[in-house]
Amino acid sequence: MVGFRRGPRAPLRATSSLSLRWRVMLLAMSMVAMVVVLMSFAVYAVISAALYSDIDNQLQSRAQLLIASGSLAADPGKAIEGTAYSDVNAMLVNPGRSIYTANQPGQTLPVGAPEKAVIHGDLFLSRRTVSDQRVLAIHLPNGSSLLISKSLKPTEAVMTKLRAVLLIVGGVGVAVAAVAGGMVTRAGLRPVGRLTEAAERVARTDDLRPIPVFGSDELARLTEAFNLMLRALAESRERQARLVSDAGHELRTPLTSLRTNVELLMASMEPGAPRLPEQEMVGLREDVVAQIEELSTLVGDLVDLTRGDAGVVVHEPVDMAEVVDRSLERVRRRRNDIHFDVDVVGWQVYGDAAGLSRAALNLMDNAAKWSPPGGRVGIRLRQLDPSHAELVVSDNGPGISPQERRLVFERFYRSTSARAMPGSGLGLAIVKQVVLNHGGSLRIEDTVPGGQPPGTAICMLLPGRPMPDSAYPAAPDDKKTEPVDTRGANGANSRGSANVISVDSQSARAR
């Protein structure tokens, strides 16, 4: 068996091409040259036709003058000789074949087949150009024939000068068009040059400063779009740097603790080392397992955040009732001492199934974590209008203070009271990211306003539609909320109580 192997492909050669400036300038020159050529031909044709028509009119007028004067009949020889003092050649042929001629010096009136046809009476009139002369032949009523011609050399001299003038003017026009096209192209492509320099600067120095925008034309819009790209790139780098910094900080603590415990276990197992009490060994092993679980959770949260930032998601129809059921089953396995009150309607969201499941699970985990043993967690999915439904997860825990409500959706934020609890500070940040990516909004309320404890209710509004086999009336809108900024203390709520905080996709994206 003979085998063939394809050799390596030759690298593609970069084809050299003219710059945009040269292409625009050559295009302008070509267009101007085309217009100049067309106009030159038109001018030449019009002037040439006018000059030849004027010669024909002169010959016709001279013939009519001779005929009308009657001199051709009274004294034809004298009448023809009189034309010698003008700029025409003349010939009179009588029926008896007597011929009278008068020519200009150095010229002879040409007689060809058309003129002979007029003399024989076959044609009444003939006009033609021959031997640098314009010849007119007319058959008269008395049987005579009058032939008159005029030299075209003066006319041809004028046409020669006209051709030279048109050629010079056309050449100057093309040259001016080239210079003007180059100047206009240079001025018009100056913003493109600035964009090129900015792109090279970004690639060379990571400088993401915006480019000044001049005017309001298409190039100005291109500059604005490039500035938007620079801002998005700067924000992406800032998020990446912040994520790496925060992740490193959050990973350092469990890794240090895990390393300490592992080293202690390894040291106790070396020959001759004192043995740790069994109770301490069990505690160390439990700590190691707990720290590994904490690291796994933290890494999973970081992966989810990175996945959401990159937009690598697959959108599909998602049944939120199934999402709630699956998430609730997982939470119940971890907290079987909590009572869950569930009221769910059929609702379909077109989005990321994994992201929506993670958001619902994080809300339920958060509510279960802060609920005391034997506490109750409410889970309610209700339809608000034909295109929106709301998932409300509430608990009867200690609640969230108004000052901290503005920070709980930020990455790695953990309140003072939450630092003693397990968690990475990424759960609600993931919820916020998922909700905003689906065009929804979040709202935090007290479960029991003014209660002790007040509890926490997190409301997740999602666009979608009822399931095909569901028809649920819209729930009454019994609570009014005021959207406020969730970025920190600088965006304080206008209401002093700050009992409610909300964030939606539009306000978040506007930032």
Swiss-Prot record:
* Gene3D superfamilies registered for this protein in UniProt: 1.10.287.130, 6.10.340.10, Histidine kinase-like ATPase, C-terminal domain
Q: Give the Cytoplasmic compartment stretches of this protein.
A: 1-26, 185-511
Region (Disordered) spans which residues? 468-511
Q: Which GO terms describe its molecular function?
A: ATP binding; phosphoprotein phosphatase activity; phosphorelay sensor kinase activity
Q: Which domain of life is it from?
A: Bacteria
Annotated ranges, domain Histidine kinase: 246-466
Question: How would you describe the post-translational modification of this protein?
Answer: Autophosphorylated.
Q: Which CDD domains match?
A: HAMP, HATPase, HisKA
Instruction: State which Enzyme Commission number(s) the record gives.
Output: 2.7.13.3, 3.1.3.-
Q: Does the keyword Zinc-finger belong to this entry?
A: no
Per the UniProt record, which residue ranges are transmembrane? 27-47, 164-184
In the record, Phosphohistidine modifications are located at 249
As for subcellular location, the record says: Cell membrane
Bias-annotated ranges (Polar residues)? 491-511
Swiss-Prot/TrEMBL catalytic activity:
ATP + protein L-histidine = ADP + protein N-phospho-L-histidine
Q: Where is the HAMP domain?
A: 186-238
Query: Which cofactors are reported in the record for this sequence?
Result: Mg(2+); Mn(2+)
> What are the GO cellular component annotations?
plasma membrane
Q: What does this protein do?
A: Member of the two-component regulatory system MprB/MprA which contributes to maintaining a balance among several systems involved in stress resistance and is required for establishment and maintenance of persistent infection in the host. In response to environmental signals MprB acts both as a membrane-associated protein kinase that undergoes autophosphorylation and subsequently transfers the phosphate to MprA, and a protein phosphatase that dephosphorylates phospho-MprA.
- By what name is this protein known? Signal transduction histidine-protein kinase/phosphatase MprB
Organism in which the protein naturally occurs: Mycobacterium ulcerans (strain Agy99)
The protein's gene is named mprB
